[in-house]
Amino acid sequence: MRVLRNFTIFFLFTALSLFRQISASAGDLHPVYVSCVNRCIENKCHGNPSDTSKLPLDLKLFRWDCGSNCGYECEITAENYFAAHNLPSQQYHGKWYFIRVFGIQELFSVFFSMLNFMIHYNGYHIMRRCIPDEHPAKRLCLSWAIVGMNAWVWSSVFHIRDTPITEKLDYFSAGAFVLFGSYCTLILMLRLDQLPGGKLLCWIIGVIFIAAFIAHVSYLSFYSFDYGYNMKANVAVGLVQNILWYYYSWSNRNSGLYWTRWPAYIVTSLMLATSLELFDFSPIANLIDAHALWHLSTVPITHYLYGFVVRKCSYDLTKGTFKIKAYDSSR
């Protein structure tokens, strides 16, 4: 349990450090950047930053306008200034400068987000094929994969083009995935649906989770888009989920089944992957940063997640954990 305590502390430290990084942004406050943007809007946009008439097709396609394009071009100007004066690169509105490719802001983050979508898509079909229809949690597991696919779709969209709308859709979808993952973990690990009155209990917990998500989204949408609150909410829910996964591995440590250790390995790997954000650095070749590498690292982790779910659900049936008709393992 000491290992669990240490990794819990590490997880909290890493997550809170991420919030400090998100909040800090010196580049867009630098006089070189500010004066450049003002001149660009005045001279190129003729005072109308929403104009798109002179932009190439790829920028129009991804909803760039003259003002946002000025911001991008002035990031280049500011970065050249910093390099000429031996100053470190800076972040702009919470992000590093990236080379834009055909209107796409963060090419590798988009690509790695799409890889994550594919691994969830593949996981969906593996579970659909390998989890027996008799398992009462099969639909829940499939829904988990669908929520995951949705989250990575909006992650891809957000990294293609960062706007207030795509940012909210990315954050809200990620929050839904974390919350729904915690709900699924409660059901799968603790088998709440097999308790007396378990179906009602699961329904009540589901309603509470849905109400919490609606309240969370409403607060961020209509009151204040508070990055700190959003981070803390996701950390709290994620921490509960991680503890449950660790508990499952610990409680089955003497089972003799190698795959019961996977939840602990998965959570530990996820925490280590998240630490990439803690050691943030300016993008390599202005294309790949720590955030992109974090997206890449979650691909193999998710693969093992679905592998574990399939094994556990099959084991539940063969060992009679669920009170249903006998499962024919030869199918």
Curated annotation (Swiss-Prot):
GO molecular function, one term: hydrolase activity, acting on ester bonds
Keyword list, A-Z: Endoplasmic reticulum, GPI-anchor biosynthesis, Membrane, Signal, Transmembrane, Transmembrane helix, Vacuole
InterPro entries linked to this entry: Per1-like (IPR007217)
Subcellular location: Endoplasmic reticulum membrane; Vacuole membrane
Signal peptide coordinates: 1-24
Membrane-spanning ranges: 101-121, 140-160, 169-189, 200-220, 233-250, 264-284, 290-310
Entry GO CC: endoplasmic reticulum membrane; fungal-type vacuole membrane
Topology with respect to the bilayer: Multi-pass membrane protein
Pfam family, one: Per1
Task performed by this protein: Involved in the lipid remodeling steps of GPI-anchor maturation. Lipid remodeling steps consist in the generation of 2 saturated fatty chains at the sn-2 position of GPI-anchors proteins. Required for phospholipase A2 activity that removes an acyl-chain at the sn-2 position of GPI-anchors during the remodeling of GPI. Required for efficient transport of GPI-anchor proteins.
Protein family per UniProt: Belongs to the PGAP3/PER1 family.
Lumenal topological domain residue ranges: 25-100, 161-168, 221-232, 285-289
A single BP term in Gene Ontology: GPI anchor biosynthetic process
Stretches of the chain found on the membrane's Cytoplasmic side: 122-139, 190-199, 251-263, 311-331
Name by which UniProt lists this protein: Protein PER1 homolog
Main location: endoplasmic reticulum
